[in-house]
Regions:
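Compositionally biased, low-complexity segments
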Residues: 12, 157, 163-166
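Short, glycine/acidic-rich hinge or "gate" loops at secondary-structure transitions
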Residues: 148-159
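Surface-exposed loop/turn segments and immediately adjacent short secondary-structure elements
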Residues: 1-118, 123, 127, 131
């Protein structure tokens, strides 16, 4: 019963500090002509394989319970079917419902362990969703660099995982798959 009480307290606290997305995407001014738009992402099996092999084996799985170690070890067999799946999902602007879910895990920060505000929520999302987003992020980064919309020197954050590219890829995922 005590663990149920703790879970309820944490849930109440996390809900009280949660902000709801208004669904409005930020306006991004158009700085390139229509012929240079990023309309598609090529989910080549080699790219998917590379991203699968980069997975950290101890990465926690999300609601689909697919472990990173399994995906990494089966990269050779999974890269082609996942390439096809990602391409189809991207072209349809669709995501499996389970990829839109997360397991919320409370992580203790400091202070009294009995105070719910001393915990921060960590969202464990599906590894395949993060994998697809990672391929999209790389394509966006290449596009932005190629068209001189950003460069390595003035890009905010640490290249190549810059906040600008992460923000754009998140906005793209939300806009396409919401």
């Amino acid at each position: 019963m005590e663990s149920d009480f703790k879970a309820e307290r944490l849930s109440e606290h996390f809900s009280s500090v949660y902000t709801v997305d208004n669904g409005i995407l930020p306006h991004i001014s158009k700085k390139v002509d229509g012929e240079t738009e990023l309309n598609n992402v090529d989910f080549k099996p080699e790219l998917v394989y590379k991203h699968l092999r980069k997975l950290k084996e101890k990465t926690s799985s999300g609601p689909d319970h697919l472990p990173a170690l399994l995906l990494k070890n089966l990269a050779g067999s999974l890269s082609e079917p996942l390439s096809l799946l990602f391409s189809k999902l991207f072209s349809m602007s669709a995501l499996p419902d389970i990829w839109k879910l997360a397991i919320i895990t409370p992580v203790y920060k400091k202070g009294s362990p009995s105070d719910a505000s001393n915990y921060r929520p960590i969202s464990l999302t599906c590894i395949l969703s993060k994998l697809m987003e990672s391929v999209i992020k790389d394509a966006m980064l290449s596009y932005l660099l190629e068209h001189k919309l950003i460069n390595k020197k003035n890009n905010t954050g640490v290249y190549p995982s810059a906040p600008l590219v992460r923000s754009y890829s998140s906005a793209l995922m939300i806009g396409l798959f919401h």
